[in-house]
Swiss-Prot record:
Basic and acidic residues: compositionally biased ranges: 9-24
NCBIfam families: rpsS_bact
Family under the similarity heading: Belongs to the universal ribosomal protein uS19 family.
Pfam families, per database record: Ribosomal_S19
Chain spans, region Disordered: 1-30, 78-98
Gene Ontology MF annotations: rRNA binding; structural constituent of ribosome
Name of the protein in its database record: Small ribosomal subunit protein uS19
Lineage, highest ranks first: Bacteria, Pseudomonadati, Myxococcota, Myxococcia, Myxococcales
Species annotation: Anaeromyxobacter sp. (strain K)
C-alpha cells in the first residue's frame, strides 16, 4: 500500500541535514548512509550517496528520474550468479518426435 499523500515523503532527518549542509557549502562529497528507506527528494539530485546493501556501500548518483523512489531500490542486496549450466545442458537435447 502506498504512503498517504497528506503525510508527504519520508526521508531521515540526518540525511536531509547532510544534503542541506552540502548544498550550502557547494560540496559534492559522497554521503554515506544506511537509510535505504528514505525517499529521494528533489534536493538530493546531483549528489552521490553510498547506500549500504548489507555487506558494503554501493555508490548511487542521484538524477532527476530517481526522484520519488527509495534509495534502497538502487543498491541491490542479492547477487544472482545464474542457473547452473549442468541443468541447462541436460534439459536442452529434447528427444525428436517422428
Amino acid at each position: 500500500m502506498a504512503r498517504s499523500i497528506k503525510k508527504g515523503p519520508f526521508a531521515d532527518k540526518h540525511l536531509t541535514k547532510k544534503v542541506e549542509d552540502a548544498n550550502k557549502g557547494n560540496k559534492k562529497s559522497v554521503i554515506k548512509t544506511w537509510s535505504r528507506r528514505s525517499t529521494i527528494l528533489p534536493d538530493f539530485v546531483g549528489h552521490t550517496f553510498a547506500v549500504h546493501n548489507g555487506r558494503k556501500f554501493v555508490p548511487v548518483f542521484v538524477t532527476e528520474n530517481m526522484v520519488g523512489h527509495k534509495l534502497g531500490e538502487f543498491a541491490p542486496t542479492r547477487t544472482f550468479h545464474g542457473h547452473s549450466a549442468e541443468k541447462k545442458a541436460a534439459a536442452a537435447p529434447a528427444p525428436a518426435k517422428k
